Amino acid sequence: MSKVNKEGAQQTSLLDVLKKKMRQAREEAEAAKDEADEVKRQLEEERKKREDAEAEVAALNRRIVLVEEDLERTEDRLKVATSKLEQATKAADEADRARKSMETRSQQDEERANFLETQVDEAKVIAEDADRKYEEVARKLAMVEADLERAEERAEAGENKIVELEEELRVVGNNLKSLEVSEEKALQREDSYEEQIRTVSSRLKEAETRAEFAERSVQKLQKEVDRLEDELLLEKERVRNLTEEIEQTVQEIQGS
C-alpha cells in the first residue's frame, strides 16, 4: 500500500510540474502578445508622427511658396519704388538746378518744384518701407527654411524608428509563433500524460480493489484456520480421552 501511495504521489507531483510549466508557457505567450501589442502601438504612434511631420513639411512648403511669391511682389514694388526714386531724384535735381538758375521764374515753377520734392519724399518713404518689408520677408523665409529642415529631420527620424519597430515587431512575432508551437506541443504532452495518469490511476484502483479483496480473503482464511485448529485441538482431546478409556477398559479386562 505505501509503494502504491508513493507512486501516486510521484505521478501527482509530475502532473503539478507539468501544469506549472504550462502556466509559465501561457504567461510567456501572454507577455509576448502584450509586447507585440505595445510594439504595434508604438509603430502606430511613429507612423502618426511621421504623417504629422510630412503634413508639417507640406504646410511649410506651401508657406515657402507664399513667402517667395510675397517676396517677388515686394521685390517688384521695391524695383518700382527705386525707379520712381531715381526718377524723382533726377527730377528733383533738375528742378533744383532749374530753381537755382531761374530764381525769377513764376510761382507755378516753384509749386512744381515743391511737388517734385514731395514726390521725392514719398518715394523715399516707399523705398524705406519696401526695404523693411524685404528684410522681414527674408527673415521669415530663413525661419521657414529652418523649420522645414527640422521637420524633414523629424520625418527621417520617424521613418528610421518605424523601420526599427517593424523589425522588433517581426522578432516578437517569430517569438510568439515559437511560444504558440511550444504551447501546442506542451498541451499535447499534457493530454498524453493525463491519459497515462488516468490509465495508471485506473490500474491502481483495480490493484487496490484486488488487494482489499485479498486482504478480506486472508482474514477469512485465517478465521477458517483458527476454526480448524480449534477443531483439531478438540479432536485431539477426544482421541486422548478415547485412548484413555480404551486403556482403562483393557486394564479392567486384564484384571478380571
UniProtKB/Swiss-Prot annotation:
GO terms for molecular function: actin filament binding. The keyword Protein transport does not apply. One of its GO terms (biological process) is muscle contraction. InterPro entries: Tropomyosin. Residues 23-53, 85-116 are annotated as: Disordered. It is found in: Cytoplasm. It comes from the Eukaryota. Residues 1-256 form a coiled coil. The keyword Coiled coil applies. Residues 24-52, 91-114 have a biased composition (Basic and acidic residues). Keywords: Actin-binding, Coiled coil, Cytoplasm, Muscle protein. Gene3D superfamilies: 1.20.5.170. GO terms for cellular component: actin filament; cytoplasm. Belongs to the tropomyosin family. Tropomyosin, in association with the troponin complex, plays a central role in the calcium dependent regulation of muscle contraction. Involved in muscle actin filament organization and muscle arm extension and morphology. Also has a role in male mating behavior by regulating the copulatory spicules. Binds to F-actin. The molecule is in a coiled coil structure that is formed by 2 polypeptide chains. The sequence exhibits a prominent seven-residues periodicity. This is Tropomyosin. It comes from Caenorhabditis briggsae. The lineage of its organism: Eukaryota, Metazoa, Ecdysozoa, Nematoda, Chromadorea.
